[in-house]
Amino acid sequence: MELSDANLQTLTEYLKKTLDPDPAIRRPAEKFLESVEGNQNYPLLLLTLLEKSQDNVIKVCASVTFKNYIKRNWRIVEDEPNKICEADRVAIKANIVHLMLSSPEQIQKQLSDAISIIGREDFPQKWPDLLTEMVNRFQSGDFHVINGVLRTAHSLFKRYRHEFKSNELWTEIKLVLDAFALPLTNLFKATIELCSTHANDASALRILFSSLILISKLFYSLNFQDLPEFFEDNMETWMNNFHTLLTLDNKLLQTDDEEEAGLLELLKSQICDNAALYAQKYDEEFQRYLPRFVTAIWNLLVTTGQEVKYDLLVSNAIQFLASVCERPHYKNLFEDQNTLTSICEKVIVPNMEFRAADEEAFEDNSEEYIRRDLEGSDIDTRRRAACDLVRGLCKFFEGPVTGIFSGYVNSMLQEYAKNPSVNWKHKDAAIYLVTSLASKAQTQKHGITQANELVNLTEFFVNHILPDLKSANVNEFPVLKADGIKYITIFRNQVPKEHLLVSIPLLINHLQAESIVVHTYAAHALERLFTMRGPNSATLFTAAEIAPFVEILLTNLFKALTLPGSSENEYIMKAIMRSFSLLQEAIIPYIPTLITQLTQKLLAVSKNPSKPHFNHYMFEAICLSIRITCKSNPAAVVNFEEALFLVFTEILQNDVQEFIPYVFQVMSLLLETHKNDIPSSYMALFPHLLQPVLWERTGNIPALVRLLQAFLERGSNTIASAAADKIPGLLGVFQKLIASKANDHQGFYLLNSIIEHMPPESVDQYRKQIFILLFQRLQNSKTTKFIKSFLVFINLYCIKYGALALQEIFDGIQPKMFGMVLEKIIIPEIQKVSGNVEKKICAVGITKLLTECPPMMDTEYTKLWTPLLQSLIGLFELPEDDTIPDEEHFIDIEDTPGYQTAFSQLAFAGKKEHDPVGQMVNNPKIHLAQSLHKLSTACPGRVPSMVSTSLNAEALQYLQGYLQAASVTLL
């Protein structure tokens, strides 16, 4: 694409269309942009539009499109073509910083994100002048430019907070510190001076405080991994100024908005984070500053209001106290009884109250409320911070703290009892306080794993939780109902089983509650209870114990999906999946009705898939329905095909990318259920599965390979006779997969199925070419994963076609190649093979090479016979060699570029481990002994001589053990 006015005009028109609400106009425009984004100059055209276009909407659209383009395409993925040509990459890096800094803020943010994406890949090695260019802009004095630099630096450096320590990371941080720490410190001091100069200028202060927030965030990122020498030397400057800012109160920066945090609150929040970081990680160096910060933050807490805009500030301030009180160094600051009482009264209890804003979120923004309360994303809430502070104080003062707070709990419950309809918030706070007190350690998966023994959880459950849940009106006091259900979920490992069993029908009843939070919590609680394990690792609750409630459970779960706001509720669908899994055969009578409802739901959500977890659990539930029913009645598979195939066809025809990998997995499960040949409905699909476009999406690959394997397992003869012209296409797929380091193992899965199941004559003409392709890949790019897969394949080939056939095909490609493969690959690398089935295949294959390949006994290959036997005994007896060369450590990590749908494995569509050797060989060691005995009878005297003269003593001892176990000898 040329950088021409005509192309700019065309691009403008298509960008306009991508904003059209009508899908008939929008989607073709999106498809067009996708189709041209591989062309040279495409990204430069977008950047040119940012400079030249007069239409601000188009400029914003171009900036978002550019950022998403960079996100999808900048990373260079090994084995895949470079999606952006080098000239475009150079031009982008040369222009983007200047363009970003000269753009309005809305566009600046998009370009800043794009720079951070590029920087993540290219900085510092491929973009060494980025920092210099950014730091030089600090001299401009223009805070629009300076804030653009700071925002970009923050995007670039914030990953230092999450990266694992490594020499490479520390080298990069040191490079950044050398270039950036001093200019940042000078800018910090200069900005604070300007704040004093412009103390009465509200608009100037807003810009300056935006800078201070970004500077404080950068301080956090640059200090997170370790305390840099520069910041240790300049701690006085930073901490004194942080303390000053923490105590600052400028009326010009106060906002009337009760919801949105202002600049002053955001800055103080970040300073609390910075102080907490130093208190936790660098307490020795920070010790002399700590008392001043404790005092300042305490004063902040007792003087800050309950408005939502202060939530982040208050939670960060409390988190600071929590991090301090957990450190043995600072224990003395909290041990006084009056201090503990004061903290409880002035900080913890007020911040555990259920405010009007919380009530509003509970009723009107339930999804966000659930995300915060149930999923642990409440990290910046007052309640979560107060809970963490209770936990921190209990570390050293469990007895006194429990005593003080128990008094508050009793008092709150008494207030509630006086007038429940008015005082229900007191009980809510009491439940939360008990939860905080009792929870010493907690995980998402298991609930509370360590509890405060001073709190009687069962007694509290019986007296204060159960009565609320037993109330006939499921819609009364919804917040308390949600609290009670959450209590069961959190303390499920502490409350005795008999009480949990009593709770199950109550929870089922609450699936009918109108409140989204209540019926969601009920579904979540049931799902968690159904996954609990008893002492023998079986589920704590048996299908028989839940049997009395099966019908009402299933009815209420599916009805809950029809309640307003819960049509795609992932917790309900997960509970449906878990109920199916627990109840097994008990659900069979209901499946005809349930599969209809699931299919209708699938059709509805396929129009616009927006809830990935819901969709995943829905497909899991479909798989469970198939598995459970067809286990006792395989013929019922036809009913599922009738119910599902119309919807599946629509999904495939409409190219619903999110669902296609799931559809293939369910189809594999259905096809594998057929015991005889492949039905014609599947064979009609077979040619379409080989289309290259399907294989372009990495998320499709595992599911497609599994489906092709199912075709080969169930219908290899049909494919050989009715679709022989498709075999080259099948091998073309294999060729594409083995060329990729990320997907070569999938190529071998497919190849192994072809070798195992296809009639030999149907692949005869392709065999040599298959081996040539494998040797080319070995030569060009040998990885441990590839070697392991290659070893399994050649041994499977040996089992299927015979040892002599393997030797002949190798030597047919190149004379003496068989010996090279033995010497360079099989003997030295066999120890790396892992997995019971894989080891068994290799053991049986190598046994065949040792005992059924005449050239091994009477040619130049004979010298390799004993080393091969030694390596096989090593495979049996030595630990697996799991060493991986340094440069390969990350090859196996599947990195899905850009926005491509990642593959999500359906647990209940899982394929049983297939053993191609099967009953033919039960014990490979005995099989080796018997095969060696048979060989020794054919050529008496040779085998004992070769074994006794060349095998090492330890291996010989193991071999004698195998011979004894098989009751045979070598003649």
UniProtKB/Swiss-Prot annotation:
The modification Phosphoserine is found at S112, S931. SUPFAM superfamilies: ARM repeat. The modification N-acetylmethionine is found at M1. One of its GO terms (molecular function) is small GTPase binding. InterPro entries: ARM-like (IPR011989), ARM-type_fold (IPR016024), Importin-beta_N (IPR001494), XPO2_C (IPR005043), XPO2_central (IPR013713). It holds the Pfam family CAS_CSE1. GO terms for cellular component: cytosol; nuclear envelope. Keywords: Acetylation, Cytoplasm, Nucleus, Phosphoprotein, Protein transport, Transport. The modification N6-acetyllysine is found at K574, K824. GO terms for biological process: protein export from nucleus; protein import into nucleus. The keyword Iron does not apply. Residues 29-102 form the Importin N-terminal domain. Belongs to the XPO2/CSE1 family. Found in a complex with CSE1L/XPO2, Ran and KPNA2. Binds with high affinity to importin-alpha only in the presence of RanGTP. The complex is dissociated by the combined action of RanBP1 and RanGAP1. Interacts with CFTR. This is Exportin-2. It comes from Bos taurus.
